[in-house]
From Swiss-Prot:
One function term, GO molecular function aspect: protein phosphatase binding
Tissue-level expression: Expressed in many tissues.
Phosphoserine, modified sites: S548
Name of the protein described by the UniProt record: Myotubularin-related protein 9
Gene Ontology CC terms: cytoplasm; cytosol; endoplasmic reticulum; perinuclear region of cytoplasm; protein-containing complex; ruffle membrane
Modified residues (N-acetylmethionine): M1
Keywords: Acetylation, Cell membrane, Cell projection, Coiled coil, Cytoplasm, Endocytosis, Endoplasmic reticulum, Membrane, Phosphoprotein
Gene encoding the protein: MTMR9
Description of its domains: The GRAM domain is required for cell membrane localization.
Subunit structure, as described in the record: Homodimer. Heterodimer (via C-terminus) with lipid phosphatase MTMR6 (via C-terminus). Heterodimer (via coiled coil domain) with lipid phosphatase MTMR7 (via C-terminus). Heterodimer with lipid phosphatase MTMR8.
Keyword Cell membrane: yes
Positions of the Myotubularin phosphatase domain: 123-498
Amino acid sequence: MEFAELIKTPRVDNVVLHRPFYPAVEGTLCLTGHHLILSSRQDNTEELWLLHSNIDAIDKRFVGSLGTIIIKCKDFRIIQLDIPGMEECLNIASSIEALSTLDSITLMYPFFYRPMFEVIEDGWHSFLPEQEFELYSSATSEWRLSYVNKEFAVCPSYPPIVTVPKSIDDEALRKVATFRHGGRFPVLSYYHKKNGMVIMRSGQPLTGTNGRRCKEDEKLINATLRAGKRGYIIDTRSLNVAQQTRAKGGGFEQEAHYPQWRRIHKSIERYHILQESLIKLVEACNDQTHNMDRWLSKLEASNWLTHIKEILTTACLAAQCIDREGASILIHGTEGTDSTLQVTSLAQIILEPRSRTIRGFEALIEREWLQAGHPFQQRCAQSAYCNTKQKWEAPVFLLFLDCVWQILRQFPCSFEFNENFLIMLFEHAYASQFGTFLGNNESERCKLKLQQKTMSLWSWVNQPSELSKFTNPLFEANNLVIWPSVAPQSLPLWEGIFLRWNRSSKYLDEAYEEMVNIIEYNKELQAKVNILRRQLAELETEDGMQESP
């Protein structure tokens, strides 16, 4: 297919762009295969470049011969284009709708994008499983890398290489895979060097109504326990929901077969509930006519902050089991690709200082989301505005980033990255020139040959010139476990995501720049003080030597 076939009118003059908190801009609108571009005739610096893949929905209005297109983006932005001529407006709208809903992944922009920067580091090879394994293999000999899934035959949503107990052979793993949802047998998620406890994750056991068991599965997770120790199974579903899945062949671990494990049920909502929550929240944020009571009522009705609280509470429970009770844990929901990954990731941010650095967080995203099989292509296909909802869309990753922001806000000096880093990840998960978030799992990414045909997001982010934008000026390395508050008063709305297009950020940006300047000035003064102290010490040493006989 040629993109030209979808572009009925490639260029229109005298188009007026309207955006909140910006003056209207008149210019030329151009459509390419992947971008909507508006360039001002008066000022060449005034430009809009918008990826078609970032467009969630469009509305059309007509007043006489003037047409208006309202574009609603996946990053929650809303922009308005006034286009002279009804035919031109209809053609532009038709082209945008076609180009923003391309069926084939290989027609998306990452397959056509060519970087304008020098690639210093190939991000596709920055966080390989072998490298991650080396970080803790020196502290324990109880784990090994397994290549049982190298052809993706055992579990289509797992990577080719996984970490499992050394005492469990590959044949046993194949048997366990038939007992777990989607073949997702228990694998290592995190090793706590302080006490050797671990977090494992998996899909639900397929016990069904008959109470089916798998001795290899029991042996596998028991291999993570120390002598005389008990472990915890954290099921992210309520007991009622977990029991209902038994009728469909799913279920949970029976106490009789797992006597060394205590099962705890939490109530993190399934992914399809979350999409409706996001729609309600964004709708409330965009309505500027609310009085205070109405705003608070709509915010509460969205249940977004309730989801945040439930996820963070479960992550804190997991971290508490590991660090304070000295117990290993297994985490799963139903599929093991959504709430499971939210909890394992957040628990690591609480427990492990490395996950609070830029590269450590990138490694976490790579390991616990991309390689672990979170279906980004499905979950991020649409955002809060799309009219044609599919059952698999859900802001699971955005909820996770919101939880990270909540912890960052409570511990502003313990994270090497800033809020802009989290916002950038949200934007690229939904629309990007990079191939990192394409596909639903490693199997699909291999078939698409993303490493050969697209650029990794990490190749761009980890350039020194870009890193400075995402670095937290307040960062001071903190090697302690951090315990966030989950009290309702401690969990505000993330304005940087949900209100950034509805308010001017001018004064916030100026205040941030001033803070950075003050911190840099303090560092310069501290460096001068250190030099003067060193010189004073040298002078005192010389005086002492001269006075001695």
